[in-house]
Amino acid sequence: MSLDLRIEQQQKSLWCWVAVSVSVKRFYTTATIHQCEQASSQNDGKPCCDDPDACNVKDGYLMAALQRLGVFRQLVEDSVPFELLAAEIAQKRPVCCRIEWRDRTGHFVCIDGYDGRALFVKDPWDGAFLRVPYDEFKTRYRGSGRWTHTYLTTP
């Protein structure tokens, strides 16, 4: 089962949170929100559309970004059971996840479907659609990523 969420590729190296939040909003509505506009809203109104490099900061918070766009429902500070993911997808709600790399930096992705126990992961880093076994996604996403937080969304 797949929701066919179209993930935007992040326009700056640290804008995974921007691309994920904008992609989820676009999944639920026809609203057009540019990544630089969303980045500006989280950077004290800096003109990110005029100078995106000045806004390429790592303190972007996905929860606040989803809240600002009206599509945030709940934060779980951990991974969640496969059955919860399946239930969210069945309700046509993509699930966002924070991945932590070995160097303790983070990255955000979206899950928009599954087949058996394999998850359909949309990654804004390169716009990739990846089919990743659930157990691998929890502890070894792209080799070394560990799933640390789950963001449930709502229309």
Regions found by a protein language model. Give the residues of each.
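N-terminal carbohydrate-binding/catalytic regions of secreted carbohydrate-active enzymes
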Residues: V20, V24, Y28
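Long non-globular sequence segments
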Residues: R6, Y28-A31
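A short glycine/serine-rich beta->alpha loop
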Residues: S2-Q11
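Disulfide-stabilized extracellular ectodomain repeats and their linkers
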Residues: S13, I33, G45-K46
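Conserved active-site-adjacent core of cysteine acyl-enzyme catalytic domains
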Residues: L3-D4, K25, E37-P155
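Short coil/loop linkers at secondary-structure junctions
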Residues: A31-T32, F72
